[in-house]
Amino acid sequence: MLGQLVFDEGRGGPKRALLYGLPVLRCQADPEGFWGERRLKRAGHSLYTGGAVRALVPAGFDRWPLLLKLGLRPVDPGAFLRAQAAPLAATLLERQGLSPDRATVALRGHRADGEMLRAALALCPRVRRLTISAPRGGEQLAAWLRREYGLPILPADAPAQAALLLQPGTEPGDAGPCPALTLFGPEPDLAGLRLSAPDLAPTDREDLPLLSALWEGGRLTPGQLKIT
């Protein structure tokens, strides 16, 4: 169950609701004033005991240590962003004045996994070449892609015009001089790109945790996303 914390002066316990068609357990709390922290604790406890393990929170929320102690955690946008790796990389190249079909993109991580494979397969029809840098399984993945699909995979240290950092432990500096997209962690770095869902309310369109939850729940499709 996904929880949703809403800042409001209303009272009452958690209620089941639909958020753009996605079932959530919603709880209201007023964080202001002398009793604000107590109200937040009560709301967080209600969400957790109601079955929520992850929670969506208002923009700018800075009380996560409190919710983490109660057993709640944020929605990680990483998987959602990695699923958009190909269009994000293509847009990043175009922002540099480069045609994707004439550019090289680097995929970087600690190990070659299913997400890296899917990113490679999605990118190959769009870009000219790929490089794969992953100490665990990277060379094997590159060899398999060459053998099975005839894909142009360059050595891991070959220069690239854009890099996708797919896993924790990889840093923008690892990509060399080319711009990099950090597609993991609670604060991903999209190198100035903006991923949005224009059909949502203005305050929700660029809320990555919300977009991630909607994508996970089948309520958001690639055609509903916009990269600017």
Question: Positions of the model-derived regions?
Answer:
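Rossmann-like adenosine-cofactor binding region
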Residues: 149-202
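Metallocofactor- and cofactor-centric catalytic cores in central/energy metabolism, strongly enriched
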Residues: 7-17, 21-65
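A short, well-structured beta->alpha microelement
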Residues: 32-45, 139-161, 170-172
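Structural motif
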Residues: 6-8, 29-32, 57-61, 107-111, ...
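Adenosine-phosphate binding glycine-rich loop
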Residues: 7-20, 28-32, 179-228
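Glycine-rich phosphate/diphosphate-binding loop of Rossmann-like nucleotide-binding domains
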Residues: 95-159
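A glycine-rich, Thr/Ser-enriched phosphate-binding loop motif common to dinucleotide/cofactor-binding enzymes
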Residues: 73-91
